[in-house]
């Protein structure tokens, strides 16, 4: 999800060509508003905000530099005068209304963006820890099953994960594989050669 600041920056990134006739840019304004309205109706408020922002930027920052807008009325033909009047009407009536819509959208999108960041932060560490715990529990279960521990005995041994941290459980597995029985017992079990085979010596 993008922030409203990112959406605004992207909305400004378009090439304005003053040689394009004013009436074509006025049609572009209508298209931008239609796109914004359609996106809003289908629930894509981020894209709706993008189109509204581009519309306002075109009307207030780009079009004032258009040669037809900057020309005096005496130097324009009748059609151009009508286009200038239409543009001024946009500035007086439509733009203020669109700015209010954008303000409401911005408030909603900013709140959604903050919730999105919090959700991402909460989901980073917890799945990793959960997977490690489940993996160690499975290793302990397989280890004691192979050695004939069942029922209460296995439950007692595997319950270590409830009150020992990850490193302590690693040490428990290491002691068992090296022939030392868990929980301080003097019993020594035979370790199968299938565990941790010798690695070849590097020359």
Swiss-Prot record:
GO terms for molecular function: cysteine-type endopeptidase inhibitor activity; K63-linked deubiquitinase activity. The keyword Translocase does not apply. Belongs to the RFU1 family. GO terms for cellular component: endosome; membrane. The gene is RFU1. This is Regulator of free ubiquitin chains 1. It is found in: Endosome. GO terms for biological process: protein K63-linked deubiquitination; ubiquitin recycling. It comes from Candida glabrata (strain ATCC 2001 / BCRC 20586 / JCM 3761 / NBRC 0622 / NRRL Y-65 / CBS 138). Keywords: Endosome, Protease inhibitor, Thiol protease inhibitor. It holds the Pfam family USP8_dimer. Gene3D superfamilies: Phosphotransferase system, lactose/cellobiose-type IIA subunit. InterPro entries: USP8_dimer (IPR015063). Inhibitor of the DOA4 deubiquitinase involved in the regulation of protein degradation by the proteasome and maintenance of a normal level of free ubiquitin.
């Amino acid at each position: 999800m993008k922030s409203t600041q990112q959406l605004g920056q992207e909305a400004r990134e378009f090439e304005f060509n003053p040689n394009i006739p004013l009436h074509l840019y006025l049609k572009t304004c209508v298209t931008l508003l239609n796109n914004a309205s359609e996106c809003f109706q289908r629930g894509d408020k981020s894209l709706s905000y993008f189109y509204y922002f581009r519309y306002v930027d075109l009307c207030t920052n780009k079009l004032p530099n258009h040669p037809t807008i900057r020309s005096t009325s005496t130097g324009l033909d009748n059609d151009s005068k009508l286009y200038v009047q239409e543009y001024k009407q946009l500035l007086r009536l439509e733009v203020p209304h669109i700015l209010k819509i954008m303000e409401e959208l911005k408030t909603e999108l900013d709140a959604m963006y903050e919730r999105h960041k919090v959700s991402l932060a909460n989901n980073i560490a917890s799945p990793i820890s959960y997977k490690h715990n489940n993996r160690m529990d499975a290793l302990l279960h397989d280890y004691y099953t192979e050695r004939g521990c069942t029922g209460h005995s296995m439950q007692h041994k595997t319950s270590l994960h409830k009150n020992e941290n990850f490193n302590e459980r690693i040490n428990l597995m290491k002691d068992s594989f090296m022939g030392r029985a868990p929980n301080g017992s003097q019993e020594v079990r035979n370790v199968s050669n299938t565990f941790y085979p010798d690695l070849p010596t590097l020359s």
